[in-house]
């Protein structure tokens, strides 16, 4: 019974950290701060028309900016997930020094977080391009909505309102990853 309680507590910690810290917090705040202004610097400095006068299509320019954003946040999330996997595998209950069973769960959490970052990043970047002055306010409203829907999913996973949210599907993906591993 004591082993079961230790394992249940450890699993709960891993799942809660993955859901709240990775999908809800990192998944919302990284795109809000990084992808919303991917093209804003060039627009404010007045150098955007110089970049767009080069023989590269406007869509490609934005696409490469989004790919750069995804590369940076993906590497960050993967490194952070591997560090968390190492920490939780060392402090978790078990007979061996390192629990290798935690690594697939954390890699699944990283993959889910990267998908959420891609969805929010492309949404926030699009809003930032379409509404350069007021896009940040709309993105904050969307972020508050998504955060509320994420907590609604944590409290009531079967809620039909929360199924309209990216964070809901990210949290459901983490549940699937945990069940599969």
Where in the sequence are the language-model features?
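Helix-loop-helix units of permease transmembrane domains in multi-pass membrane transporters
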Residues: 37-71
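Terminal transmembrane helical anchor/hairpin motif
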Residues: 2-14, 130, 135, 139-181
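Amphipathic alpha-helical recognition patches that constitute DNA-binding helices
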Residues: 47, 122, 126, 139
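Secretory targeting signals
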Residues: 1-37, 62-134, 172, 178
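Hydrophobic alpha-helical transmembrane segments
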Residues: 12-19, 51-62, 85, 142-152
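Flexible domain-boundary/linker segments
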Residues: 56, 65-68, 73, 78, ...
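Perimembrane helix-loop junctions in membrane proteins
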Residues: 41, 45, 88, 92-96, ...
């Amino acid at each position: 019974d004591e082993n079961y309680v230790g394992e249940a507590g450890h699993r709960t910690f891993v799942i809660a950290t993955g859901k709240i810290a990775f999908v809800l917090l990192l998944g919302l705040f990284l795109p809000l701060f990084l992808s919303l202004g991917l093209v804003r610097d060039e627009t404010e400095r007045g150098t955007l028309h110089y970049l767009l006068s080069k023989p590269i299509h406007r869509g490609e320019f934005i696409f490469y900016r989004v790919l750069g954003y995804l590369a940076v946040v993906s590497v960050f999330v993967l490194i952070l997930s591997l560090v968390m996997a190492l920490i939780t595998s060392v402090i978790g209950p078990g007979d061996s020094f390192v629990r290798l069973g935690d690594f697939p769960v954390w890699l699944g959490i990283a993959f889910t977080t990267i998908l959420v970052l891609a969805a929010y990043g492309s949404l926030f970047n699009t809003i930032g391009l379409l509404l350069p002055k007021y896009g940040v306010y709309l993105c904050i409203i969307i972020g508050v909505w998504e955060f509320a829907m994420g907590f609604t999913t944590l409290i009531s996973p079967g809620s039909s309102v929360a199924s309209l949210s990216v964070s809901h599907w990210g949290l459901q993906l983490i549940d699937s990853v945990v069940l599969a591993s």
